Design a protein with these regions (language model features):
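Bacterial signal peptide processing site
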Residues: 20-23
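Post-signal-peptide N-terminal segment of Sec-exported extracytoplasmic proteins
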Residues: 28-30, 37-77
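C-terminal partner/receptor-binding element of secreted or periplasmic proteins
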Residues: 89-108
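Bacterial N-terminal signal peptides that target proteins for export
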Residues: 1-11
């Protein structure tokens, strides 16, 4: 009985950790001539137009756009300033295609 409880606890913790942490590798990496601010101003309305509810934040000199999910881990776009504009990292974690990455590509 103890083994079953310990296994269930370990599995539950693993699932929760996957929701709370960012993966090491982005799903998509893009370069843009736009600044992070210009990119965010483009992508947020596109996500809203796809019935998503993006949350924009600006931690430590970059922009982060998060789309919360009740079923999977949150989808995240991070836009950083680069020498020729910006660098964009897309972390699309939903199981089915949602148009999240496509919106980022359209704003490059």
């Amino acid at each position: 009985m103890r083994t079953v409880f310990a296994s269930a606890t370990l599995i539950a913790c693993s699932l929760l950790a996957g929701c709370a942490s960012a993966p090491n590798e982005p799903t998509l990496t893009l370069e843009t001539s736009k600044s992070p601010e210009q990119f965010a101003a483009c992508v947020v309305p596109k996500l809203q137009g796809r019935s998503m509810s993006p949350i924009l934040s600006q931690p430590q000199r970059h922009y982060r756009i998060t789309v919360p999910s009740t079923v999977a881990a949150d989808n995240v776009i991070e836009a950083y300033k680069a020498s020729s504009g910006g660098k964009v990292f897309v972390y699309e974690r939903s199981l089915m295609a949602s148009g999240f990455g496509r919106a980022a590509k359209e704003c490059v």
